[in-house]
């Protein structure tokens, strides 16, 4: 394991680890040890997103934010239905959710990537750009998704929609890296995809003997929620950030006092994603059987209670897509999705069938994956649509 010594604001030492995973909060990205918490000024919802810039120096900014348009370039009408090519409902449901992700769709329709990409063939960003453009510009039609979208994944049978979704997101992230494969891990997290879907966990361990504190940061692209004991998404999030006691055989080896001592471990979201992907863990890892229970989820979700920084005001997200599984096992059943189109109308996207729906129907589903976008970003998007304004940069000021 290779360690690099870096500094946060000139005072906190990092120990960097070479292996990263995007969705597991227990995989370390960077660790800080100190004897007490420093004073920090309150942060706004807008500035909190940029905290990841302080985790480590960025050697190279792979996707400048001024090149990520947030305002809409999309047609007003809902787009095309997708043809099922044989057990590909999981592909179609996932693609529809990504197609109606505002910052991703706006970037794809800007053709920013294809104008500079030298790969084209085998590039997931180019493939997704072609798909999203076709889907959104062919309302009332049914189109056939390119086989390249599921190349290397689809094996002619029913697959897990969430696994395909993250396979696609990861492939798009890798497509941002040609020519930059030797950059450091933190710079890789400045890609277009991480700017849209990414954030950072903070795992904080406090030694109860010397009160020393160790912070570990890890990037994420989605958040998995255990729903076994939860009746709502909020309850599942509360369980996720609930402090854990480390004692007895599980006592903590403190790097400050160098003793094995009882400690408290707390996981929180250090930086918030522009677009939040919440996956409800409905399937058993062993049997694949489904947890077929109703888990309530809101149209508007305040993520502030689960953030590292408290007392900074609400951090509200709005629901814009829901991926649903109908059936009793991950090995069979049917996937479809609900998406919120540009004008605010909800639609059920069930392979080739596209039908208008209501928020009441959307909120009554046994959801598998939920897609939320920061309310401030959605409002900027909606405002630009109503005023017919030109696309603005992600994170730019009015």
UniProtKB/Swiss-Prot annotation:
Residues of the active site are: 89 (nucleophile), 334 (proton acceptor)
Q: Which family does it belong to?
A: Belongs to the peptidase C19 family. USP17 subfamily.
Q: Which UniProt keywords apply?
A: Cytoplasm, Hydrolase, Nucleus, Protease, Thiol protease, Ubl conjugation pathway
Q: Has keyword Chloroplast?
A: no
Q: Give the main EC class.
A: hydrolase
Q: Which Pfam families does the UniProt entry name for this protein? A: UCH
Judging by the UniProt lineage, the source's domain of life is: Eukaryota
The record's section on InterPro entries has: Papain-like_cys_pep_sf, Peptidase_C19, Peptidase_C19_UCH, USP_CS, USP_dom
Where is it predominantly found?
nucleus
Molecular function (GO) terms listed? cysteine-type deubiquitinase activity
Where do the USP domain residues begin and end? 80-375
The protein's Enzyme Commission number: 3.4.19.12
Q: Name one GO biological process term.
A: regulation of protein stability
Report the protein name in the record.
Answer: Ubiquitin carboxyl-terminal hydrolase 17-like protein 6
